[in-house]
Amino acid sequence: MNANDNVVIVGTGLAGVEVAFGLRASGWEGNIRLVGDATVIPHHLPPLSKAYLAGKATAESLYLRTPDAYAAQNIQLLGGTQVTAINRDRQQVILSDGRALDYDRLVLATGGRPRPLPVASGAVGKANNFRYLRTLEDAECIRRQLIADNRLVVIGGGYIGLEVAATAIKANMHVTLLDTAARVLERVTAPPVSAFYEHLHREAGVDIRTGTQVCGFEMSTDQQKVTAVLCEDGTRLPADLVIAGIGLIPNCELASAAGLQVDNGIVINEHMQTSDPLIMAVGDCARFHSQLYDRWVRIESVPNALEQARKIAAILCGKVPRDEAAPWFWSDQYEIGLKMVGLSEGYDRIIVRGSLAQPDFSVFYLQGDRVLAVDTVNRPVEFNQSKQIITDRLPVEPNLLGDESVPLKEIIAAAKAELSSA
């Protein structure tokens, strides 16, 4: 690297910002330009469905860095600017205002966008009381409409849908949550964990309806507001506010148009490079081969974005990056903290540590004798211990995992001893 090297980062979310500041912290001396179409100061997204929506956080408290930190680190922040094309031959990105920025290294941190509800096109999608939750503007609009005794219909039983439902219940709204799946959190948790969260929400007052498909909407006479949600089973649900959260689509169009390999994300190698070695990708938009799980994955999480950003900074500055860590996720609903580590896909059994009747347990997902993932509810110590089990692939004794008379740290110590003697 030298003082004339140019790094352009496309995307001003967490991944992009962390790459920029990580480069400076690692000794990068060249130019850094951070480009994104958002017009607000880069900010954290997870609190939008939690503290911010509940009115317990301000926009300023969500900033990833203070506004003056960018100039202080000689990072040029180009907000409100869209990158429309990549010219790989000239090593330039083309901006919406016609400018071209030269790069020696290009980092795509383009993130993702909410998966659209197929039946919510036209006037429905433009209605002020029909929203997805991805941006600060979305959260502000929703927060203004969290009015006591009003009727909220949430479409989608994933993390966002459940977190929004919990916040709305606390605002004394009447909440109905619809999910096409047979249970909430079906894609990411085992049936007992889904049952725990369904019970938790129903006890709080949420009307959860699984196996329910939305087929349309009723609109006000002026076509400005949604007045009811229509379901395939004939149910009509009057609504003052509708929020849809049915997944994320990675923003790969820029990469695809530039001829980069795309497959449910921008495909990258172990060095974070795309099919063009001068272009890297990071965060929600990046698909990579996990060494831990020996399969291709795309992970939507804050910890993954942070880890990959640090890896890019280390690689570009000629340093040795850390080994892959187990991915982890979290969700706060009511006063319950759910923390999950690992990827449970492919598990063939679960072991419960604690009682599912109380908000104080861990669920281990196993494939054979290997622990693939762990869900912990209000057990932060076991969560941290579980990260070690999965990252280090420790051969813990499965029969002991459900026995609370044996501390998890002792199970881990025995597994380490077995590894060292092998």
From Swiss-Prot:
Record's InterPro entries? Answer: FAD-oxidoreductase/Apoptosis, FAD/NAD-bd_sf, FAD/NAD-binding_dom, FAD/NAD-linked_Rdtase_dimer_sf, Reductase_C
Biological or metabolic pathway of the protein = Terpene metabolism; (R)-camphor degradation
Reactions catalysed: 2 reduced [2Fe-2S]-[putidaredoxin] + NAD(+) + H(+) = 2 oxidized [2Fe-2S]-[putidaredoxin] + NADH
- Gene Ontology CC: cytoplasm
Q: What is its EC number?
A: 1.18.1.5
Cofactor(s) for this protein?
FAD
Q: Which GO terms describe its biological process?
A: (+)-camphor catabolic process
Q: Which parts of the sequence bind NAD(+)?
A: G156, G157, G158, Y159, I160, G161, L162, E163, V164, A165
Supply the induction statement. Induced by camphor and repressed by CamR.
Residues binding FAD are: A15, D37, K50, V83, R134, D284, V302
> Which molecular function GO terms apply here?
flavin adenine dinucleotide binding; oxidoreductase activity, acting on NAD(P)H
The subunit field of the Swiss-Prot or TrEMBL record says: Homodimer or monomer.
- Family note: Belongs to the FAD-dependent oxidoreductase family.
Q: Which function does this protein serve?
A: The oxidation of camphor by cytochrome P450-CAM CamC requires the participation of the flavoprotein, putidaredoxin reductase CamA, and the iron-sulfur protein, putidaredoxin CamB, to mediate the transfer of electrons from NADH to P450 for oxygen activation.
Q: What is this protein called?
A: Putidaredoxin reductase CamA
**What's the source species for this entry?**
Pseudomonas putida (Arthrobacter siderocapsulatus)
